[in-house]
Structures are given as C-alpha cells and as structure tokens.
Amino acid sequence: GPLTEDMSMVERIEFVKGPAGFMLANGDPSGFYNVVTKKPSGRNKGEVGISMGSFDLYRANLDLDGKFSEDGKLLYRINVMGQLKGSHRQFDFNNRYSVVPVLKYLIDDKTSVTLEYTHQFSEVNVIGSNYIFSKKGYADLPRDFTTAEANLAPTKMNDRSLLVIFDHKLSNNWKITAQAAYFNYQQQGASLWPQWPVAFDPQNDSILYRGMSIWDVLGTSKIGQMFVNGEVQTGAVSHKILAGMDMSNKEYYHDWNQGGALGGEFNIYAPEYGNATQPVFDRTKSIRERGVRYYDGYTGLYVQDELGFFDDALRLTLAGRYTTLKTGDIYSGDFKSSRFTPRIGLSYSIDKNTAVYFVKDESFLENYGSDWQQKSFDPITGGNIEAGIKKDWVNGKWNSAVSVYQITRNNVLTADMDHPNPAGGYYSRQSGQQKTKGVEVDIRGQIVRGLDVIINYAYTEAKVTKDSEKGNIGTQVPGSSRHIQNAWLNYKIDMGALTGFGISAGYQYQVKRSPWFVFDGSENSLPDYFRLDGSLSYQKEKIGFNLVVNNILNKYLYSGAPYEDYFYWQTEPGTNMRFSVSYRF
C-alpha cells in the first residue's frame, strides 16, 4: 500500500538486481526491492519490545507465532505495533499503529493456504510541513524550522490490505502458486505549500505567502498472480522453468481542488505562530463525487527457461513477457498499449567460489498523467545491460561482488516550463531519454573473530541524453549522486564475562549530488553528504538491549531542489538516539 511497511511486520528486505531480477514482475530496469512480511513458522514463540528515544518517541511491538490446532495444520502469526513520535521540526509528529494477523492452513503435505490481513494507521501533521523554503539558497534556515501551525488538523491515513496465497506441490519437481490481493487506502488531510504564482513578496525575500489545500484520497487496488515453476531434464541439459501471468486494476480518487491562504504575510526569519486563519474545506460530498478519478492496470504473460549445461556450471536464461497497459482519467481519456519485452542472461561458475554473469533486460511501464493539451503520455520503455563477477574468499569468510551496468529509460517526463499549471507548478512534457552507467562494488567479511565489516561503493553517471530542451542534454539526472560509499563495522563478543555485548558503527558518504528536480539546463549540485551512526547492544539469553545513535557528528543534513525562483529542501534531525528493550519467549 501507499504507507511504507512498518518494520515490526517485516521479516527481511530483498534487494533484487542482476540475474535474480528475472522474476515474474512488471519491474523497472534499474531493479527493485522485495519486502517479505512475517509468516507463521510452525513454532510456538513470541517477542515483545519497547523503545524510547529523541523527539518524544514511545513505541511498543508484539510478535506472536504459533499453532492453533494440536495437529499443527492451522498456524498463526500476529504482529501489533503502536507508536507516538514527535520530530526535530516544530509541531511535526507521526503517530501510527499497525495490526497484521496471518493464518496458514496446511491442507495436506502438498497444499497450503495463507491469509494475511494488514491494517496500518498513520496520523501526521499537514503534508508539506517538512519542507523549508527560501530565496537565498539551501540551509538558510534552522533545521527545526516549519511553515506549519500548531493547531492545524492532522492528516489521517488508513491503509488496509488482504492477501491470499495458495501453494500446491504438483510433484517433487513442480509447484503452482496463486496469489490475490486487495488494497484499500483512505486519506483525509491537507497540503501546505507556498502560494502560486507569487510565493514570496517581490519587495521582501523574508515574506512568504503560505497556501493550504485539501488533499483527500481514496485508492483501491486488485492484484492477482499465478505461476508454475519446476525442473526437467532433456539429455545433458537441465531446465528450470517459470511461467505464469499477473494482472492488476488500480483506481484512485483525489481531491486537491479546494484551498486558500494560510494566514497573511509570514516572515521566515522571524516567524510568529498561532495567528493564521485556515481555509475551510467542504466534505459534505463523498470523495467519489468531488474527487478526480484515475485508473490504471496491466495484464502480463511471462515464460522463462534457465538452461543448465556441464552439470549446471554454465546457465543460459531465456525469458519473455507480453504486457498490456491501460490508464485513464477525465483529462486525458483512456490509453492502452501492449509490448513484448525479452530477457536474456548468462552465468558461469568458474569454480565453487567464483561466478560471472551477463544480463540484458527490457522494461515497459505505465506513465501517469497528461500534458498541457490533456494528451496521455506514452509508456516508459527502457533496458538494462549488466555484467559482473562474484567470489568467495578464505573458505567463505569473505565474499565480494563487482558489477558494471547501463540503464536506459525512454519517454521520461520533465517539467514543461512553457506551460504553467494554474493549480501550481508546471505541466509535464514527454521528451526525454536518460542513460545511467555505473560500477558497483560490494565486500563483506570477517576481519577477526567477532568483527565483521560490510563495504559498498557505487559510481553512477546518470545523464540526460535526449530532451526537447537542448540545454538539458548532458546534465546530471535529478536525484542522483555520482559517488556513494558506505561502510559498517560490527563487533560482538562471544566469550568471557562480556559475552553478548556488541558495538557497531558505520557511515554513508555521497559526492556530487544532484537535486530532486532541475529543468533549467544546469545541475545545481548539492553539497557532499556524510553521516556517521553507531550502536551498542547486549543480548543475555532471552532479553536484549540496544542503543542506536544517528548523526553522531550533528551535521546539518538535507536534500532539496530549486523551484520557481526559490529553493526548497528537507532536513534530517541532528544527533538523535533510540533505546530499545526486547524479550523473547
């Protein structure tokens, strides 16, 4: 759903790239990540945790896992979380709770049905209150600055979903899986943004004119997937086959058509809160009556065969997907398009510790919205070419991976600077191509007993290669960084009086960062980014303690972009901490 999954319900997060990207999915050429939620394990166990921290953070979570029936056929798992959380920004908060019950029924030793329900609720300050605006440039105001007021009505979000999974083992080598999901998202709130077309007083850069508009949303999604996978042998060649179909239908209603000024003049350098008059919104009609309807959907057929040669030392993957996309709204009408996208991959195990691979993949994705003439946008097309090598060292204590890639995206949307949108900002236009070339290096291993390290480096050259505005060609793609380097050290004592004690530290370093959105032919690079974090932990049998400290150096960290004739950015908190206690039973 639109709300990010709370970590209390997450088992693990899988970052999918390289040969692993050959999955039954309508995916982006740059890869994707997969969130795996907690499922019943068949064991009776549980965990409870309590956290407190900076900015009035209070949080509790409960994880229960077990069997409903004595024969072990009916399993359950339930995760419950509640959180009250302030912010480093004035008047800002994020209060939320989630309830995630899961049932799994083992019909027999070959068949199972899983039913998962998720309800997440979030209450935050008015949307947009986390942005800072100034005509003088980035970091011109304190990181706790806000344009919001203390008495604004909160924005409330309810995100509900129901997932059903059916698994059946056809034989020892073949399996069929069917999944169906329904998502329902409801939001009632408002958005805070500078007024348009005049955000700042032309005679005084200190005076900002704030605007506030309604932002109510109703979204429903129906998603289905069915596939079969298995293995066969034809002579000396093995085959790992995956074939299936997936489809979705999504419908959204948005209301942002009511709004007005939030108070009068607002001095960003000497703000006075509590005197602003708020616009009043009319919600007597349902969101379906007053909102604008958008919909999109797709149907895809997919087949893949991984052929293994020389006892599977050499693996050739051939795959193809046929996708039909459909989108529509009252402005641009209905749009439908179909395309076949092939995939090919080759990997070879040089020895038991070393493997090389090559991947060529194409993509076909919907493009939402319309231009100033209400013409629908063509789908995004593109492709990924990637090659790499993976190797284990020192009997598996160290492993490394190096890859090079080029990602191409066509029909990219950019701002149409010739056609302002009366509702604010600019219309979009479809005129671009972006190419991203890069190198990624991942290293992890054990330095000495108990001391582990993870090191990542990524060099990314992301450029605009085609654009109707010639001045944009050759500029860095908005929102990208040329260099990103991370490292994380973790030391855990496993003997002696201090057994169970651990200490960790790590950093992230970004160089030559591009702003979120730049459309004027320049790059307007953001300053380099460096953040240092650390933690202390102690595990004693069933009870654990953990202290996390973020932004240890208390740096003013932010990201942003130029907009109209001013700048806007989001800040990260200064040094902050979180202390957690957990108990397993």
Model features per residue range: what roles?
Residues 167-181, 185-191, 381-446, 452-465:
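Membrane-embedded beta-barrel scaffold of Gram-negative outer-membrane proteins
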Residues 429-517, 553, 580-584:
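Gram-negative outer-membrane beta-barrel transporters
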Residues 106-108, 219-221, 238-242, 246-250, ...:
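Structural signature of Gram-negative outer-membrane beta-barrels, strongest in the C-terminal barrel
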Residues 508-518, 537-585:
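C-terminal beta-signal and adjacent terminal beta-strands/loops
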Residues 123-136, 251, 334, 347-429, ...:
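Surface-exposed extracellular loop regions of Gram-negative outer-membrane beta-barrel proteins
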Residues 83, 87, 100-169, 184-219, ...:
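Acidic/polar loop-and-plug regions of large Gram-negative outer-membrane beta-barrel proteins
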Residues 162-185, 210-330:
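Face-selective signature of the C-terminal outer-membrane beta-barrel domain
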Residues 8-11, 22-99, 107-111, 160, ...:
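Outer-membrane beta-barrel translocator/receptor signature
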